[in-house]
Regions:
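Accessory DNA-binding and partner-docking regions appended to nucleic-acid-acting proteins
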Residues: 8-24, 358-359, 370-375, 384-386, ...
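Helicase motor core with emphasis on the C-terminal RecA-like subdomain
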Residues: 7, 14-31, 35, 39, ...
Length: 625
């Protein structure tokens, strides 16, 4: 075994390890087939190569893995990647091996014999990159081997899991600094996450004990994603319509409960769609089998709870539909971000109903207590979860640009209108709602600030509901004063007043409307209010589609996909690990004739060119004659 001298692997002098003769761009091209770095990747790579810790906050699909994989191939030593995601480890290791990189993973999916084999190979220095589940880091056998190895870097994926205020807190992440401290010398550390508020970012830096880290935020925008919120009367009918419009496309349908997953999956299967399911109630073998069916394109649609998808690197997901509203914006954006990872246009559609809010309130209030938190801390977590749910609800009811709402939530800036969301493409007009707001606020005040949205709407619209009448609410002066106002419009105005601080909705399961101090100016006529309200005729909100290929190239693309599928099946790997759809489309456009031209295709590296070039060039040649 090779024992690196202390002077070489010392943290302060870690840059000595860098193979400076190898240009990072040549590594990027040779192994990953890319000619240039994306936004942020260059700075992060330079920082890690120079021995400075990094906190990288980059949206899903922005190429976080490149940020540590390129330096890993330039360091003399080994890189340890900490990841909580078994499926992602498997896919990324497969992709690295396909690209000519010696890599392995250690997690609970390995048999004891496989685990011992990986340890043996690790000890003999056979791997350049090792993915490890956080629970396995401090295992005596693994830690004992690592103490004697030249470990150049530790990369922490899904770093928000270290924070108890994050949406995926995992106590095992708190052990990562102990693992690093137990090594003979401190490696450079990179922490990466797709979604992190300011509080979570501070936690990551503190709890992972990052040393003067370079913080790189590339922006949260995913320009190729089209965001849409719908409030259908019948979700199942609307879902079938959406799926039929996307026939043969790969997509994910997220549901909030196991029961909903079963019902939606059965609905899709009965209507002839190749759908499968994933939730925590299934045994591990079935979950793995169903996940593989989706990853290997045997099933085109995955219906799942949020237990699925955080570690799925499937590049050709063209739509994500949320059948139910998630609990918070962090979860929503991460799950929606599974779409369009290949850079092609994709749809992110949320089907909203008020029932979703109540379901999530129930889940928050009845969540399993965390034994690592005190009761006061647990209550604070619930309070923050309720606040995040409120923001998620505002997203579903807002009339402003959905992309702008998302970006502002994460502290980023966006245009007033993106023209690539359902709100921007819907037919709304800027409407004076001052009088309507006064009527609503007056009703809330005159009924004693004791009722929720439904009752207030019923009073204002003059409902003949017996319970309302028996409660004496029909005798209120505000009873029926908005009888001509459609219920949806009335609810939209109430949501707008709550979202902008003129009223509050207090309580969890059945929120009560109350006036906020800000309402005084409106009630006294000193302030006017306007909002974007939908007018009857509405443009169809449809995502921008990728420019179509010529008919001849469409046939070539189909042939290339068939070849890719055949090659993938022979190796028992997902098709997108061979080449992504975006790479196949680039082949159709460039139509390379030689190995030299083939390697110029985006996404084709040296190893893949040698492994697959002759097969793909032969098919391209057939269509070029």
């Amino acid at each position: 075994m090779f024992f690196a001298p202390q002077s070489i692997i010392n943290f302060i002098n870690i840059s000595v390890e860098v193979q400076t003769v190898r240009d990072k761009l040549s590594v990027l091209k040779e192994y990953f087939g890319h000619d240039s770095f994306r936004e942020g990747q260059d700075r992060i790579t330079d920082s890690l190569l120079g021995g400075r810790d990094v906190l990288g906050i980059m949206p899903t699909g922005a190429g976080k893995s490149i940020c540590y994989q390129v330096p890993a191939l330039m360091f003399d030593g080994i890189t340890i990647v900490v990841s909580p995601l078994i499926s992602l480890m498997k896919d990324q290791v497969s992709a690295l091996v396909q690209s000519g990189v010696a890599a392995a993973y250690i997690n609970s999916s390995l048999t004891h014999a496989q685990y011992l084999k990986v340890l043996q190979n690790t000890e003999s220095g056979k791997y350049k990159i090792i993915y490890v589940a956080p629970e396995r880091l401090c295992a005596p056998a693994f830690l004992g081997i690592c103490r004697n190895l030249n470990i150049s870097m530790v990369a922490v994926d899904e770093a928000h899991c270290v924070s108890q205020w994050g949406q995926d807190f995992r106590p095992s992440y708190l052990k990562i600094p102990d693992f690093i401290d137990a090594l003979n010398s401190r490696p450079v550390v990179g922490a990466f996450t797709a979604t992190a508020t300011g509080a979570v970012r501070d936690d990551i830096k503190t709890l992972l004990r990052l040393v003067s880290p370079l913080v790189v935020t590339t922006g949260f925008d995913r320009p190729n994603l089209f965001f849409s919120v719908m409030q259908p009367k019948n979700k199942s009918i609307e879902l079938m319509k959406l799926i039929k419009e996307r026939k043969n496309e790969s997509g994910i349908v997220y549901c909030s409960t196991r029961k909903a997953v079963e019902e939606v999956c059965e609905l899709l299967q009965k209507n002839g769609f190749a759908a499968t399911r994933y939730h925590a109630g299934l045994d591990e073998n079935e979950r793995r089998r169903n996940q593989d069916d989706f990853v290997y394109d045997r099933a085109t649609i995955m219906v799942a709870t949020n237990a699925f998808g955080m570690g799925i690197d499937k590049s050709n997901v063209s739509f994500v539909i949320h059948y139910n509203m998630p609990k918070n914006m962090e979860s929503y954006y991460q799950e929606a971000g599974r779409a369009g990872r290949d850079g092609r246009n994709a749809d992110c559609i949320l089907l909203y109903s008020a029932k979703d809010v109540r379901t999530n309130q129930f889940l928050i209030n009845n969540s399993e207590p965390n034994p690592d938190l005190t009761e006061d801390e647990q209550e604070e977590v619930r309070r923050r979860d309720r606040e995040r749910l409120k923001q998620m609800t505002f997203y579903c009811t807002t009339h402003k640009c959905l992309r702008k709402f998302i970006l502002e939530y994460f502290g980023d800036k966006g245009p007033e209108r993106c023209e690539k969301c359902s709100n921007c493409l819907s037919n709304h007009e800027n409407t004076d709602i001052t009088v309507d707001a006064q009527k609503i606020m007056s009703c809330v005040a005159r009924t004693g600030q004791r009722y929720g949205k439904k009752v207030i709407c019923d009073v204002l619209r003059g409902s003949k509901n017996e319970r309302l009448i028996s409660a004496g609410l029909s005798r209120q002066s505000t009873y029926g004063i908005m009888a001509d106002c459609p219920e949806k419009r009335l609810r939209d105005i109430i949501d707008h007043l709550c979202e902008n601080g003129y009223m509050t909705a207090q309580g969890d399961e059945y929120p009560i409307l109350k006036l906020a101090p800000k309402s005084r100016g409106v009630l006294t006529g000193q302030e006017t209010l306007r909002m974007m309200l939908e007018i009857p005729q509405k443009k169809k909100a449809a995502a921008a589609k990728d420019a179509p290929l010529p008919p001849a190239d469409e046939k070539l693309l189909a042939a290339l996909k068939d070849l890719r599928k055949s090659l993938a099946m022979r190796q028992s790997i997902p098709a997108y690990v061979v080449f992504t759809d975006a790479t196949l489309i680039d082949m159709c456009r460039l139509k390379p004739k030689t190995q030299e031209e083939f390697i110029e295709v985006s996404g084709v590296g040296q190893a893949k060119s040698q492994r697959y070039g002759e097969f793909f060039l032969a098919v391209i040649a057939e269509f070029s004659e």
